[in-house]
Design a protein with these regions (language model features):
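Acidic, Asp/Glu-rich intrinsically disordered regulatory regions of eukaryotic Ca2+-responsive proteins
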Residues: 1-237
Length: 237
């Protein structure tokens, strides 16, 4: 009997997500029900960005993966005709500043050669090399999307509304994700999430789970460009 109780205790400890002496593990809860809602939630996805509400990712009628990794899809919108930022509604000054920061920081690591380019191009084929630290780890180091890490963004930090993030919840998330001494990662993370918040927040000042998911696969940018041009985009909750 004692052996059975000991085995039960060991089994419970083996899957525990909270440690009593580490209160932060209780404060930032992780999802324990994902396997009942999403097939293989811990398996990195190369082509699609699913969540518990969209188990196959963004529908093909809205967004096509073109056999690119999810990280490649995330940046490909801006390579279509060199005016992606303008198509989303950012003015010339903002677009210029974004280009300086993004290309200045990420161009060299994606180049196919050791020789720098004065034009600061970003090669989508090598965009996985530009993954920085202090991020959400929703992308792995090869540019695949990890559904469980995406879901945990909201279980950990969405306190007001379960599937939305307020500005301060977003700020808290970027603070919590900081790696030691990673100054570039701290700045890059604040910049990226700040731009996303300005771009996609709703009328109540929340950033929805669906907007964040579609940012990861790049379909959010297509949605915003179509909406700005007066096209039929449907509803995105």
């Amino acid at each position: 009997m004692a052996t059975k109780a000991s085995n039960d205790e060991a089994a419970a400890a083996a899957v525990a997500t909270v440690a009593e002496k580490a209160p932060i593990t209780a404060e930032r809860k992780v999802r324990t029900d994902l396997e009942t809602k999403l097939h293989n939630p811990y398996m990195p996805r190369a082509l699609a960005a699913p969540d518990t509400e969209n188990v196959n990712g963004t529908t093909r009628s809205v967004h096509k993966h073109q056999n690119m990794s999810v990280l490649q899809q995330h940046v490909a919108f801006f390579d279509q005709n060199n005016d992606g930022l303008r198509a989303m509604g950012f003015n010339v000054v903002s677009s210029f500043m974004f280009v300086i920061f993004i290309h200045g920081a990420m161009s060299y690591v994606t180049l196919p050669t050791w020789i720098p380019s004065p034009f600061f191009p970003i090669y989508i084929k090598n965009i996985h090399k530009a993954k920085h630290g202090s991020d959400s780890d929703t992308f792995d180091t090869e540019g695949r999307y990890i559904p469980s890490n995406f879901e945990n963004l909201f279980s950990k930090y969405a306190r007001t509304v379960p599937d939305k993030l307020s500005f301060w919840e977003l700020w808290h998330m970027t603070e919590a994700n900081r790696n030691a001494l990673d100054v570039f990662g701290w700045i890059a993370s604040k910049f990226e999430w700040g731009v996303l918040y300005v771009l996609a927040k709703d009328e109540r000042g929340f950033l929805s789970k669906e907007a964040v998911r579609r940012c990861f696969d790049g379909s959010l940018f297509e949605y915003c460009a179509k909406m700005r041009s007066g096209g039929d985009v449907g509803k995105m909750d």
